[in-house]
A protein has these predicted regions:
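A long amphipathic alpha-helix within ATP-dependent nucleotide-binding catalytic cores
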Residues: 196-246, 268-292
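Phosphate-binding site of ATP-dependent enzymes
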Residues: 136-224
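Protein kinase-like catalytic core scaffold
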Residues: 121, 162, 184-185, 232, ...
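Active-site nucleotide/adenylate-binding loops and adjacent lid/helix of ATP-dependent enzymes
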Residues: 4, 80-162, 167, 214, ...
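Conserved N-proximal alpha/beta basic substrate-recognition cap immediately N-terminal to
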Residues: 9-104
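A short beta-strand motif that forms the metal-chelation/ATP-contact edge
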Residues: 42-47, 121-124, 176-178, 242-257
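A short, polar/charged loop-to-alpha-helix boundary motif
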Residues: 193-201, 255-264
Length: 293
């Protein structure tokens, strides 16, 4: 059996997962074309396709994950899960349908009227990451100016923008790492001085969490289950009343040893994914036997 992480670009997280063997099994990294050429029925593939640096879509490779599944490869983080994580409009619709706390979301497109605001909002790309092109608008005039400013961007012309209710910033968020319906790690991300966004790419810093809040973990697991993801980062914001709001999901989440002071986060993640793949293969085999009986 081969275990493969399917990604278009190398990343420190994928390198660390490759080093985290599970018994006699170990991971390798393949791009979508290599995966199609090498993986066969009974192998395992984990989709690690990310959003594009240009913010106008996803890495090219969902087609390969679909073809691998049709071939009999066990695919974790399949095309539907990755799209649901990376497409913020789809994320919002799924979470709303499952009644999981998430900011009110509106889709801005060329020619569509600007909504009437009930409070501050955030404008961001539909396929965004790293805090890039994320704009806070405290009133209707700021929203109009922002939408006028981004209308020439390639990402806006292709997909429009997401306008979301602003969850009042408290200077930090909680990123929970979920693997196979288990919390395997978490960190607080603390915003840089004078910055309301918590992204590390914008100067935010990670703070280890020795004991992730139980409610936050349950919300993160439910969000991962809602989109069908086997490995996902769930960004949570405190709602000011003791609860948590799902801000975003990351289907190609990057993480470090800071995410888990109580165990080796890469070994735990690797083991959780392998066990999930074995469980899924067992269920598929039982279903096939029942059909043949």
């Amino acid at each position: 059996m081969r275990l493969a992480l399917i990604a278009c670009r190398p990343s420190p997280t994928n390198v660390a997962l490759v080093r985290a063997s599970f018994g006699d099994l170990s991971w390798e990294t393949l791009d979508p074309h290599e995966a199609l050429a090498n993986l066969r029925s009974g192998d395992v593939a984990v989709g690690r396709l990310d959003v594009l640096p240009t913010l106008d879509g996803m890495d090219d490779g969902l087609w390969a994950l679909g073809a691998l599944a049709a071939r009999g490869v066990t695919v974790l983080n399949d095309p539907a899960a990755l799209l649901a994580a990376h497409d913020k409009l789809l994320t919002a619709r799924i979470l709303r349908r499952r009644e999981i706390a998430h900011p009110w979301t509106w889709h801005s497109r060329p020619g569509r009227p600007v909504p009437r605001l009930l409070g501050p909002v955030v404008v961001k790309p539909r396929f965004g990451s790293w805090g890039h092109e994320v704009h806070r608008c405290d009133d209707a005039d700021a929203l109009r100016r922002t939408l006028e400013r981004v209308q020439g961007a390639a990402w806006y012309r292709r997909h429009g923008a997401i306008v979301q209710e602003l969850v009042h910033p408290q200077g930090y968020d909680l990123r929970v790492l979920v693997a196979a319906r288990r919390v395997v790690g978490a960190v607080h991300r603390v915003a840089a001085p004078g910055e309301w966004r918590t992204n590390v790419a914008l100067g935010g810093v990670r703070r280890p969490v020795t004991d992730p809040p139980l409610e936050a973990g349950l919300v993160a697991i439910e969000a991962a289950r809602a989109i069908g993801a086997s490995l996902v980062g769930v960004d949570l914001l405190p709602d000011g009343f003791g609860g948590w709001v799902v801000a975003e999901l990351n289907g190609a989440v990057e993480f470090t040893h800071e995410y888990a002071a109580w165990h080796d986060v890469f070994a735990e993640t690797s083991g959780a994914l392998v066990r999930e793949a074995f469980d899924r293969q067992g269920r598929d085999l039982a279903l096939e036997r029942s059909r043949l009986a």
